[in-house]
UniProtKB/Swiss-Prot annotation:
Belongs to the ProQ family. Keywords: Chaperone, Cytoplasm, RNA-binding. Residues 154-167 have a biased composition (Low complexity). This is RNA chaperone ProQ. Residues 105-182 are annotated as: Disordered. It is found in: Cytoplasm. The gene is proQ. GO terms for molecular function: RNA strand annealing activity; RNA strand-exchange activity. Residues 105-125, 168-178 have a biased composition (Basic and acidic residues). Disulfide bonds: none annotated. One of its GO terms (cellular component) is cytosol. It comes from Erwinia tasmaniensis (strain DSM 17950 / CFBP 7177 / CIP 109463 / NCPPB 4357 / Et1/99). RNA chaperone with significant RNA binding, RNA strand exchange and RNA duplexing activities. May regulate ProP activity through an RNA-based, post-transcriptional mechanism. Its main location: cytoplasm.
Length: 230
């Protein structure tokens, strides 16, 4: 008996009871309603086994009978069972209603926790940089649109467009997308693509989550490598 293994957690105790009394307890699936006063039966039947104490048995019963799968089994017409699976009377309406309220409260708590977790994730997401990459091929068109908006005549200067296009292309060709952040250095000047524009920025920090840069406007943000160009 001195070398008998001990059950350290409440879940281990429940697993032991399911193995010891399979017609009464279950480790998974819908659980059967237990006989009223089954705690005393447990004390008498398993006293000394696996060095279990009354406190451990009481905690295991409390966890077992408050689980969702047990509460689902508490319904009208269900029969209580003893340790050997023998019928010990039908559930009354009071116990069924009590179990229903317990289940509703448990679900409400889980839903509230889930909504709180999602709210925290949304708050954290608002602090991150834009994550919608744009195709590089659209950048020259964006620069052309800017030049037309400055002139105020988007359709008439047709002859000037072929001359300005090579200059835009040459500027794009001079930039190279960043494929390896190890080639970057703190303090290095860099281009940040956001939407259809490329903005000047300075590298503040390089980490596994991205590159922290400061724009010419003074705004600091974390961006991913695909939004950076030399």
């Amino acid at each position: 008996m001195e070398n008998q293994p001990k059950l350290n957690s409440t879940k281990e105790v429940i697993a032991f009871l399911a193995e010891r009394f399979p017609l009464c307890f279950s480790a998974e699936g819908e659980a059967r309603p237990l006989k009223i006063g089954i705690f005393q039966d447990l004390v008498e039947r398993v006293q000394g086994e696996m060095s279990l104490s009354k406190t451990q048995l009481r905690s295991a019963l409390r966890l077992y009978t408050s689980s969702w799968r047990y509460l689902y089994g508490i319904k009208a017409g269900a029969i209580r069972v003893d340790l050997d699976g023998n019928a010990c009377g039908q559930l009354d309406e009071q116990h069924v209603e009590h179990a229903r309220k317990q289940l509703e409260e448990a679900k409400a708590r889980v839903q509230a926790q889930r909504e709180q977790h999602q709210a925290k994730k949304r708050e954290a997401g608002e602090a991150t940089a834009p994550r919608r990459p744009r195709k590089p091929a659209r950048k020259p068109a964006a620069e052309g649109e800017q030049s037309r908006s400055v002139s105020g005549k988007p359709s008439r200067p047709q002859a000037a467009r072929p001359a300005s296009a090579p200059r835009a292309e040459s500027r794009v060709e001079q930039r190279k997308p960043v494929t390896d952040t190890t080639a970057l250095q703190v303090g290095q000047s860099i281009k940040v693509t956001a939407g259809k524009n490329a903005m000047d920025a300075t590298i503040l920090e390089i980490s596994k989550d991205g590159v922290r840069v400061q724009l010419a406007s003074g705004l600091a943000m974390i961006v991913r490598a695909e939004h950076l160009q030399f």
